[in-house]
């Protein structure tokens, strides 16, 4: 009796363009079908005939092979607020956009990830629902310092705290004393302490959070549906004041990496440069929306654009891009993330003329109050084409093989959205590059295709995003997670069940 044929032990992907170790090159990538890891990389396109008969082989030329993106700032909201998002839909949206790893924020789920018990509930909720790999952050809140070391042992990738009201009562803001306690606990742990860096400067203390939450606002005066009114209520001094507070405490834990999430105000950049020159271990991220949306373009009532810190002026956006494009070792903004923070459409209070609005028959027409609407941008899985569209406009990118700007742009995106985000969460030896020993997380990117963002291409749960209707350049053709094709733009989700893993090993 003839023995059944053996399953090939490897699969192979190749392209005339791939970003390997930060460099655009031709490449052939050999993947172990047993481990899902890359076993070899060659800097040329090797023909299929050079491999054993039956080896799965695809040459994706002229599309670009990129490392799967690592989105290090996503709110998946499960358990507790699954009507806002969930592991299943949120990770499908990620895979659609070439994101192969997401790190889930500690708030907007109930319970928040501020205790080991809360983390275990989240893990239980996530099991069997993730289409890509998922890691978790812990939170710092008043009174939970005693939980932090245990959360490190349980594998959280870092910790986040707010210096201003978070918008949800179960995740209160921390005081300077709370931060000191957290720093004491985490000073010698392999982790990162991150902050939502907005706080009320002393001059605003008399009106408190009413500046940003009351309706009508306590200050400044103006129509609540006007974006200019909202923007004036969250000035850049909120960010600079918070960063100064954090830096004043940094000496308490000099070996603990600090990180500013979703930096919006360009005025923060000189403060961070000075701190890094003085030896403070601090970095920052910015978001796709701060790099692509501008205050001048936001219509009255279009609360799809509401987030905190707010989207600022075009001039400010240019300042963020200028910093981002500095030499890799000089810039303080190291990473770009989505900060996907969705909600149900009704919480956006959109007027009926704005796409994504929610108004049942007989309801009073919403005015689009920027002060009452939920703050958060929905964009997980859209980041790569958003970045490519912006860079195409700014750098006049072409598809010519020798276009130096295109080469630089591809390499920059991999640094900002793959390699550096992986390093931020301690996955630099596993994710964010296409080299032997790493997970075969691959994004097949068509850098010339253009497409329109529609509800059918927003795979997150609620189809309410400021990007709806926009034409984007750059399309993810396929997404591979640990050596298996998960998503194809032509065929959808190839596997019938989610196979993403939870990243629970302790950071080292």
At which residue positions do the language-model features occur?
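Histidine-rich, glycine-flanked metal-binding segment
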Residues: 2-67
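Alpha-helix-loop-beta-strand connector modules within alpha/beta enzyme cores
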Residues: 116-132, 179-195, 382
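Metal-associated gating/positioning segment near the N- to mid-region
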Residues: 50-51, 55-129
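Active-site loop-to-helix "anion-binding N-cap" substructures in soluble metabolic enzymes
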Residues: 108-131, 137-144, 150, 163-169
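Histidine/acidic residue-rich metal-binding segments in metalloenzymes
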Residues: 146-161, 165-336, 352-362, 397
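His/Asp/Glu-enriched, well-ordered alpha-helical/loop segment
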Residues: 228-255, 326, 343-445
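C-terminal cap of metal-dependent C-N hydrolases
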Residues: 354-369, 436-503
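Structural signature of the urease/amidohydrolase superfamily beta/alpha-barrel
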Residues: 272, 276, 334, 338, ...
């Amino acid at each position: 009796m003839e023995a059944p044929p053996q399953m090939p032990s490897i699969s192979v992907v190749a392209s005339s363009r791939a970003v390997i170790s930060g460099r655009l090159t031709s490449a052939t990538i050999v993947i172990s079908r047993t481990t899902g890891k890359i076993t070899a990389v060659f800097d040329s396109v090797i023909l299929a005939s050079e491999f054993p008969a039956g080896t799965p082989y695809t040459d994706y030329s002229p599309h670009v092979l990129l490392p799967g993106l690592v989105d290090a700032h996503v709110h998946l909201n499960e358990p507790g607020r699954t009507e806002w998002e969930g592991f299943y839909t949120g990770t499908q949206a990620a895979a659609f956009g070439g994101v192969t790893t997401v790190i889930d924020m500690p708030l907007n789920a109930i319970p928040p990830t501020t205790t080991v018990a809360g983390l275990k509930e989240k893990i239980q909720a996530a099991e069997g629902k993730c289409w890509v790999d998922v890691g978790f952050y812990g939170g710092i809140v008043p009174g939970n310092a005693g939980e932090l070391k245990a959360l490190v042992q349980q594998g959280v990738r870092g910790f986040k705290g707010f210096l201003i009201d978070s918008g949800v009562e179960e995740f209160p803001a921390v005081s300077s004393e709370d931060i000191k306690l957290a720093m004491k606990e985490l000073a010698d742990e392999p982790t990162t302490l991150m902050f939502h860096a907005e706080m009320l400067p002393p001059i605003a203390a008399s009106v408190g959070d009413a500046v940003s939450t009351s309706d009508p606002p306590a200050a400044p005066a103006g129509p609540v549906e006007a974006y200019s009114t909202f923007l004036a209520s969250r000035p850049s001094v909120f960010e600079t004041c918070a960063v100064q507070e954090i830096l004043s405490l940094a000496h308490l834990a000099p070996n603990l990496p600090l990180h500013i999430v979703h930096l919006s105000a360009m005025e923060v950049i000189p403060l961070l440069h000075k701190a890094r020159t003085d030896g403070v271990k601090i970095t920052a991220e910015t978001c796709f929306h701060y790099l692509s949306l501008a205050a001048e373009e936001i219509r009255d009532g279009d609360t799809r654009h509401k987030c905190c810190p707010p989207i600022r002026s075009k001039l400010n956006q240019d300042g963020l891009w200028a910093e981002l494009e500095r030499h890799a070792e000089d810039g303080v903004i190291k990473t770009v993330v989505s900060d996907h923070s969705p909600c149900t459409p009704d919480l956006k209070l959109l007027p009926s003329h704005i796409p994504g609005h929610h108004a049942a028959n007989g309801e009073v027409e919403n005015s689009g109050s920027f002060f009452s609407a939920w703050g958060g941008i929905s964009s997980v899985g859209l980041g790569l084409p958003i970045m490519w569209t912006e860079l195409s406009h700014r750098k006049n990118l072409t598809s010519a093989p020798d276009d130096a700007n295109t080469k630089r742009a591809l390499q920059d995106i991999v640094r900002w959205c793959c390699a550096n985000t992986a390093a931020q969460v301690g996955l630099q030896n596993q994710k964010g590059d296409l080299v032997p020993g790493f997970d075969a997380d691959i994004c097949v990117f068509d850098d010339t295709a253009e497409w329109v963002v529609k509800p059918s291409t927003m795979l997150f749960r609620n189809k309410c995003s400021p990007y709806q209707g926009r034409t984007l350049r750059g399309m993810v053709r396929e997404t591979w997670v640990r050596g298996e094709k998960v998503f194809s733009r032509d065929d959808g989700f190839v596997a019938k069940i989610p196979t993403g893993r939870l990243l629970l090993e302790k950071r080292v």
